[in-house]
Amino acid sequence: GNSPESLAAVNVARTVCKNIKFLNLTCAPEGKLAVESANDSNALTVLIPRANDKGFAMTGSYTCMELLSTLIFDEASDEQKAAWVEAAAVMGENVVAREEEVAAFLSGDYTRVTYLGSGSFGGLAQEAQLKILELAHGLTATSYDTSMGYRHGPKSFVDDKTLVFVFVNNDPYTRQYDLDILHEIGGDEIAMKTIAVQQ
């Protein structure tokens, strides 16, 4: 709601485009983005509940805005969208219920984290690595890439203190690349752990 990038993007768009409309998704009703567009007939601000983020990473806010964007812009039926929300809620409850198990599995003296995601998971991989970088205050080195791109140089980032997460795509063709890089990194026996994240 107050990021210089968001506000600058709106100002540049207003300058460059003669006929433009804005859809603002924010959880900050007092933010400049919401306030400055309140009386603008070419702007619609959709406020979402605050996610009670306590840190700089804003993981809850990001998750809510990502979900809302999908619900707004995807052409699926309302019934299908409701099913997605229900499935996401169930997955979230399962993760919370298994928090101790997950924490124990991921415990260790790691200093590097890599996220790999292809296709629709490319942006998620980038955001995930950014969140780790922010939450660890830069003390954990992070990287992200696609499954195909990673093997062509960036894989040299992996050492024996690296956790590698691969978001495994549901698309059958893309999934082959994701599973292949999982097996390749696991077979190298260098990374501390290689973890598949999938449904």
Spans of features found by a protein language model:
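Glycine-rich phosphate-binding loops that contact phosphosugars or nucleotide phosphates
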Residues: 1-84, 167-198
